[in-house]
Amino acid sequence: MNLSTLQLSKMPAWARWPLFAAFGILVLTLVQELGQNETSRLTATSTSQAMLRWCVPILLAGLGGLFSERAGVINIGLEGMMILGMWFGAWGAFNYGPYWGLLIGAIGGAIGGLLHAIATVGLGVDHIISGVAINILAPFAARFLSSEIFTQYQGGSITQSPRVESAGDLTLPFLAGGWGTPNLFKTMRNADIPWLSDIGSVLLGFSTRISWATLIALALVPLSTWILWKTRFGLRVRISGEDPWAGESQGINIY
């Protein structure tokens, strides 16, 4: 390990990640300059907005996989659980509003997780087989429910829900000009300075019109960290996956 790597490893996490992000944007800037017209949108504000929006399903699936792995359960049925959550979330948002839709969607995904738990832990089914079965059945269940319910409404079909109300969005004040405040990132973007303007453009996309649903999903990351590593429940989850017999010896009913 050389001196620069050692110094980097000693930096706190809050300082390392912005440094990695700035280096990543520098790479995008160089690729954009070399590619010219073919890569002109790499650091555009709309690109980073889309990146943030589309990372949410992957983030939620990753958090679900984290809890499963820590509990000692191989969960490859996450895609099917996400599909169930998506359908129930759309149904809930259409009937009761966006925030009820988020809650009902979480319950729908949890139903898929419960099926996986019953099959693997309760009935002893192989984890892989159970996960594959959920991934196969969930799309067909969603398609059937859509054909029976969503097709009865305008805009609905077997592949999409009727139009639902937005959960609303937030533009950060001072950084992106929210609430009529100055717009720091836009000023950086318009400065026309290599790298600095690209950083401003990317950060402007990350801080402009952020859906409240996205903010809730991002908040689940530190919340999950706290639950798994700072609470009694998290300790029990981790010991169940890492050393079940040690958990049994401490009075945790695992088997």
Predicted regions and their residues:
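Membrane-interfacial amphipathic/re-entrant helices at transmembrane-helix boundaries
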Residues: 2-60, 88, 99-100
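Alpha-helical transmembrane segments and their helix-start/interface "positive-inside/aromatic belt" motifs
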Residues: 6-19, 122-133, 255
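Structural signal for membrane-spanning alpha-helices in multi-pass inner-membrane proteins
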Residues: 30, 61-65, 89-93, 117, ...
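Single transmembrane alpha-helix segments in multi-pass membrane proteins
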Residues: 46-102, 111-128
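Alpha-helical transmembrane segments of multi-pass integral membrane proteins
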Residues: 49-53, 101-108, 209, 213, ...
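Residue-level recognition of pore/gate-forming positions within transmembrane alpha-helices
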Residues: 82-87, 109-110, 135-139, 221
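Transmembrane helix-bundle core of multi-pass membrane transporters
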Residues: 139-229
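Membrane-helix/interface signature in polytopic inner-membrane proteins
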Residues: 223-255
